[in-house]
């Protein structure tokens, strides 16, 4: 059967229309699939695991926010110090954590320098605890025994057969002592002056005298063939990491010196240094920042400097509640120094976890010993 020419033309046009429609449909399908793929790529499905991970990340960020558990206590201590016109540096430890290491007030009026954690102070009689530690070290080495009479080492010492080393350490020797001058002096001459001063009673009764520790300082030198300064540097300062501690005149040229002042009619007046530092041998010519005496305490109580047995003997209270260099105040141990107008306090709790260290270059009316008791109350 033959189609006419017109029918053939209509059939070709119909095929072309079908082809065009198929092409359009194919394009639409391609665009739809591609758009869906792009949407999935731009907006991926969030799984349950990923939601959990995001929640954990948020929680972790919250956990990293540090809250100071001692902030309230620190604020109360600062307020107490300021209310009592404390001028110096305070170093406070609670549960082996330093919660305050801060200066309050003036260090050097002339140059307008304020006290801070690096300020240096002459520590006065607080030095006796350091010297007593050195004596206990020598006992552990077998070079002496605290029960030995002093004439075993210094044959010319008055009443030397009855006065024991422990009597000097505990201020029960009965010596008269000497009158300090203001000129340089050697440790040998200091000992001769003390011997010449004689005794005023038999040993055993409490009588606090610096010269007891001058004798101990000289004993350390004789037994070790070192100066007291060199022995302490090698066997106490270095192992305890007391890097800013010194002895003698270096204090007065150190830029961190906290100058001693006294108040007169509300005016600060520089307190005069009346004696050459060598006159304070063994008993009061050491200087340091508060942090260094804390490092000493930790080295002392942790066994780094002496044994536990030696520490127990050193802290055992005798006459005047005084052991060897420390007073026993029932809930804490304390050593104290007062010289010129410096007042320094070093104390730590019986469990060795808390410490209150107050170094002043201007003595307050209340005094650091009373402040120490108040601050211990705040630490409870």
Go through the PLM ranges and name each one.
Residues 84-89, 111-167, 200-209, 281-284, ...:
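Short active-site loop at a secondary-structure junction
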Residues 72-76, 99, 130, 134, ...:
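Extracytoplasmic/secreted proteins, especially bacterial periplasmic and envelope-associated proteins
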Residues 179-250, 280, 284:
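Catalytic-site signature segments of enzymes, centered on catalytic residues
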Residues 67-71, 87, 117, 121, ...:
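Soluble non-cytosolic domains of exported or imported proteins
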Residues 136-141, 217-222, 295-301:
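Short glycine/serine- and small hydrophobic-enriched flexible loop segments
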Residues 2-98, 274-380:
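Catalytic loop of the DD-peptidase/beta-lactamase superfamily, centered on the K-T-G motif
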